């Protein structure tokens, strides 16, 4: 019996896989537990169409991320911070300040997509990493100045 898995099943397959199982396992366990459906011709056609739509959606997301990455390549950021007389910042610069500065430039990015490799405690030039997509990661330079 062939079934289409609706979720990942250990030692059998992943979601949307078409697998062959014994009749009893399919009828008595997988289908009643809503882990699979019978793989009829119509179910296979619906699955194929859903997979095509998912691929189109993922391509659009990746294209949008690439467009945003190209836009971000031309942006330079300057972040002001309160400092002591010898140039040490009170507090530190985090991804929140970088996200706020990008928002001022007209680019809305979630702060969880921004990562800084080091703690920024002094005035100077640094880089932040933006993970826009699993395949698109860019570094944005920014400068910290005294207010």
UniProtKB/Swiss-Prot annotation:
Chain coiled-coil ranges: none
Alphabetically ordered keywords of this record: Ribonucleoprotein, Ribosomal protein, RNA-binding, rRNA-binding
GO CC entries: ribonucleoprotein complex; ribosome
Entry's Gene Ontology molecular function annotations: rRNA binding; structural constituent of ribosome
Keyword Cytoplasm: no
GO biological process: translation
InterPro entries linked to this entry: Ribosomal_bL9, Ribosomal_bL9/RNase_H1_N, Ribosomal_bL9_bac/chp, Ribosomal_bL9_C, Ribosomal_bL9_C_sf, Ribosomal_bL9_N, Ribosomal_bL9_N_sf
Database matches in Pfam families: Ribosomal_L9_C, Ribosomal_L9_N
Entry function: Binds to the 23S rRNA.
Family affiliation: Belongs to the bacterial ribosomal protein bL9 family.
NCBIfam families (UniProt xref): L9
Protein's name in the database: Large ribosomal subunit protein bL9
Lineage start: Bacteria, Pseudomonadati, Bacteroidota, Bacteroidia, Bacteroidales
């Amino acid at each position: 019996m062939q079934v289409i898995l609706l979720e990942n099943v250990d030692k059998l397959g992943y979601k949307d896989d078409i697998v062959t199982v014994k009749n009893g396992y399919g009828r008595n366990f997988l289908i009643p537990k809503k882990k699979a459906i019978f793989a009829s011709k119509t179910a296979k056609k619906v699955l194929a169409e859903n997979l095509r739509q998912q691929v189109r959606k993922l391509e659009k997301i990746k294209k949008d991320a690439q467009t945003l990455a190209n836009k971000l390549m031309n942006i330079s950021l300057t972040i002001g911070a309160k400092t002591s007389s010898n140039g040490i910042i009170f507090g530190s610069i985090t991804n929140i300040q970088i996200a706020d500065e990008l928002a001022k430039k007209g680019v809305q990015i979630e702060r969880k997509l921004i990562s800084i490799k080091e703690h920024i405690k002094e005035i100077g030039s640094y880089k932040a990493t933006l993970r826009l997509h699993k395949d698109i990661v860019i570094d944005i330079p920014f400068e910290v100045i005294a207010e």
